[in-house]
Amino acid sequence: MYKGHAVAAIAATSAHAAEEALALINVQYEILPHVSTVEEAISEGAPLLHSQYKNNIASHDVLELGDIESGFSQADLIVEREFRTSTVHQGYIEPHSATGWWTPSNKITVWGSSQGHFQIRDRTSLVLGVPVSDIKVIPMEIGGGFGGKTTIYLEPVTALLSKITGYPVKITMSRSEVLEATGPTSGSYMHVKFGATKEGKITSAQADLKFEAGAYPGSPVGAASNCIFTPYAIDNLRIDGYDIVNNKPKTTAYRAPGAPIGSFAAETLIDELAEKIGMDPLDLRIMNGAKQGTTRASGINNPLIGCIETFQATKDHDHYKSEKATKKIGRGVASGFWINGSGAACAVANVNFDGTINLTIGSMDIGGLRPVAAQHVAEVLGIPVENINPQVGDTDTVGYTSMTGGSGGAFKTGWASYEAAQDVKRQMLERAAEVWETSLDDIKLENGFFIHSSDSELKMSFSELASHLPDTGGPVVGRANLDPRGPGSAFATHLVDLEVDTETGKVTILRYTAAQDAGTAIHPSYVEGQIQGGVVQGIGWALNEEYFINESGGMTNSSLLDYRMPTSLDLPMIDALIVEVPNPLHPYGVRGVGEVAIVPPLAAMANAIYDAIGVRMTELPMNPAAIRKAIKGA
């Protein structure tokens, strides 16, 4: 167990009464030997969390390419360091909340905000032993998720309490419950090593990654292993990833899970390599950058990607060309990669008789997905996007759709919306042929108008044809369900200028530029918002955020007063530099954009701090106390 582990639930007629009842529960806990960090968990004599394992290492996986020893023997220069990162939380503003109603007819309805209501339904079914056909989950607006709302905490409990009481039951977590009881991301220990020639060619790379899983196995170390070296073409690689259990809340996904942690280590060493070789850090990246056909550590060959394009866009930007004002100002650059995901998706497009369309999708909207899906439909049909009314359907009204995560929403649900629109287009062309009593081959749809290819007098707008639907067979409904492959990889390169107060250790960010390959930017302002949001979370991770764990294993800073996330007062305007290398495997070239933006900031900040104070920072967070300690120890 861990502090925050759920042990009891109470239903009452008011929150106040429930809190009073909770206070009457007296549990006597015996504090057993426990382990809070990776290094404690794998130390000799550490208490064993799970008897089915011989130690606290739940799994050990290896990715290998080429021969690392041969690669290191070719190197003129080797750099290696140890790195540590603290446990951090996703920091969504809306706490977990769910309402459950076990009806007299023995059906369950759940209202909740999550990243995947079908997954909530399926997991609630599994926990309660109730068929999925008896459970309906109605998705509510979500106040932030970032991977943290991909699992169940409350939904089965609300249903059980409802069954007992006969009334709908709502549970909303307090902030301390969110921080202590729900999945953060991993703390870590890493040892990373690079070898390179004096000309700058990276010959070999090795990483030893040990990630906290929390109380049960399942850290993002596998994703970290797949991402850590992927921005570069390196012939000889070895990555050992260890999933390690410890007495903390079970980890869950956090925006590009695992990738920011690994990138912090790798990109810090890339910067150090460039310095020791005497090479511009972006030139080093350009020389070694991954491109189409480069083999990753996983053995996958890259499709068309925009990695080097982000390096070059950053180098060409006026931010990089500008001079720093004083020696106290540091400049740092770092790059990152995220895998991007996909999954099952469904979309249904109902044509109204006035020419508008009600579009129902199965993906939760956590980053602007509804308007993006609407844009796919509008583009196919040539009608204004304002004529599309997008909504997220519940589990009874739209086909199964996988959760919104992995930067896969716009790719899979955008594609499903595209295919649903194609279905609408096909049916509407048939209706136009019926109205004009002509061959389907004679009609085409251009810019929202149905046109007869040989009779210029025959022309109807989409809305005009929609008005004829009642007389030509009734409603037109376009449907699509798919599970598309090829979501496209995401790369980003970030540049930051900051000032360090050497007396206090305070870091002030002066300028931040984030270049990212977005494929085709379907909604550029939303793409910018996703990039900016990821950067802000990465800055918080780099400078402030961490779980403070006391000797008893409890979190001591489980409030937003003490768990310090950045606000607008801590940040400059983030300059989002959109690089467009369209994904050839999507109808409109879409790549996921939501996650990779959080990957480079940790190392970019560390490299800029080094540039300012001359000390390499190898532990997160780099708060004022840590910076003062580093300066004093230099």
Locations of regions flagged by a protein language model:
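In a subset of proteins, long, contiguous C-terminal domains/tails are tracked
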Residues: 585, 590-634
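Hydrophobic alpha-helical bundle architecture
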Residues: 526-527, 548-567, 589-592
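Amphipathic, heptad-repeat alpha-helical segments used for oligomerization and assembly
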Residues: 257, 404, 408, 579-597
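Cytochrome P450 core scaffold surrounding the K-helix E-X-X-R motif
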Residues: 519-523
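Generic long, charged, amphipathic alpha-helical segments
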Residues: 389-392, 566-590
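Structural alpha/beta core scaffold segments of enzyme domains
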Residues: 1-515, 571, 605-606, 610-613, ...
